Amino acid sequence: MKEWIIIMTAANRAGILAAVTRAMHDLKGDLRESSQTVVRGFFTMIFSADFPETLGQEVIRDHLQDVCRPFSIDLAVRDPQTHLPVYAAGVQDTRAFRLRVGGRNEPGFLQVLSQLMARLDIDITGMHAVRTAENGEFEMILKLALPSSVIPDHLLHEIETVGRNFGTTAELRPAS
């Protein structure tokens, strides 16, 4: 079996996931990991799956596109071996943390926060953010891979410092 990463997006409609899983079953694919969400009416999914070695990238892509044609899915198939050595090196000796941040919805906070994470070599492995309509605020939850060199209390202090101008509150906890 060979692992492939598949990324897809389409306007959300009932039945998309059923079509995707049917196509995978047709090709004898075995799901390893997936993440799926709907954002403002658009379905998006990324997953890792093993397929028989005899199936090439084009065969997998073409079959998924054919089965999912009624949904007008945009899709890409990637070989993780091209990128995994770099990724694996980047997450060695890291600890999983969950960061919750909220505050006034003003432009610039995510940029400042992501620049801080990049400077400290912290990988953001997951993120969900939403604007709350009732009072012009935002809520965000991030999954972080902290290098062993980062002290969580110091990171929280830096987040609170850069977020002060945006009226943010932050909570950082080890991921369970």
Task: Label the predicted regions.
Residues M1-S176:
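A conserved regulatory-domain signal marking ACT and ACT-like small-molecule sensing domains
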